[in-house]
Structure formats: C-alpha cells, structure tokens
C-alpha cells in the first residue's frame, strides 16, 4: 500500500495497475502529485529516501510500541490511515482551476499545471492532522492529482496517554 501512496512504481507496475478497470492512474498527471513533509512544506511525491513502512517502524520504535505477543493472531492497531477528499468538481477546480482536464483513460493531460489552491487545501488538512495527532506522528501525507478525484492519504500514529498507566 505504501508503494501506491508514494507511487514508487516502475512502468510495468503502473501499466499493471491500470489493467484493473476500477483503477484510473493518469501517467501524464503523476508529476503533479505531491506530499507535505515533516517540515510542513510541499515536496514532490516520494522525495523522502525512506519508505512509509520504514518511517512507520522507526516511529513505533521511538514510542516503544510492542505487539501483544509475537505469535498472537490478534495485534493492536498501530496506525490510522485517513483519506481526505471532497466534492469531485470542487477538488478538480482547486487542483487545476479552469484548465481542461480529460478524465478518459489514456488521455494526455501533460499540459496541466497544479494550482496553488490545492496546495493550500492540503496544508490546511496537514495542519489539522499535526494539531490533532502531533507532527511527529504524521508518517506520510500524500496528495494524489493523477486519479479521477484529487485526494489526500494521511498515515498517522494516533498516540495518546492512558490514564491508568500514564503511557
């Protein structure tokens, strides 16, 4: 899943993904995808050297998270994945303004440029996540503009303090 959020795909993987009729990844819009890094700034998608899985494990190690038992069939959840979206037409407008977007599979949308409004929308949601869960607990925050509707994937470690144990 992390490879999909970060689009760490080669051409073969990309083509295989698009064989599924429910998928709609536009190669010509992939360059418009971005993520917000730990510094709160916009960066190209996949700019971080470490993958989501590695960053998640590092954060869990920092927190001292341990599964119930190594051989247990039931394990505690260690992260939450949020997908933020909105009205299809409105999110397209935020992303591309009045530019013509062709949503047909295989269409050439290489002329499109990302509009500032989509970056501000993403930053606002990032700020909300940081305030709610803590900036250090945001493992990944990717914005996809290469699918049918623009949306955000946020992976967070929901850290809280237990009243009885204080941990």
Say what each PLM segment does.
Residues 1-167:
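N-terminal nicking endonuclease/strand-transfer module with a His-rich metal-binding environment
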């Amino acid at each position: 899943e992390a490879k999909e959020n970060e689009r760490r795909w080669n051409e073969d993987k990309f083509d295989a993904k698009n064989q599924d009729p429910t998928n709609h990844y536009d190669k010509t819009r992939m360059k418009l995808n971005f993520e917000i890094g730990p510094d709160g700034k916009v960066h190209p998608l996949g700019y971080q050297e470490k993958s989501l899985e590695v960053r998640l494990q590092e954060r869990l190690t920092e927190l001292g998270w341990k599964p119930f038992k190594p051989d247990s069939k039931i394990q505690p959840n260690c992260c939450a994945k949020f997908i933020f979206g909105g009205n299809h037409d409105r999110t397209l407008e935020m992303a591309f303004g009045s530019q013509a977007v062709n949503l047909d599979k295989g269409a050439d949308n290489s002329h499109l440029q990302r509009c500032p409004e989509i970056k501000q929308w993403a930053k606002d949601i990032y700020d909300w996540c940081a305030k709610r869960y803590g900036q250090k607990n945001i493992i990944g925050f990717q914005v996809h503009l290469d699918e049918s509707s623009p949306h955000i994937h946020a992976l967070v470690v929901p850290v809280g303090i237990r009243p009885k144990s204080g941990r």
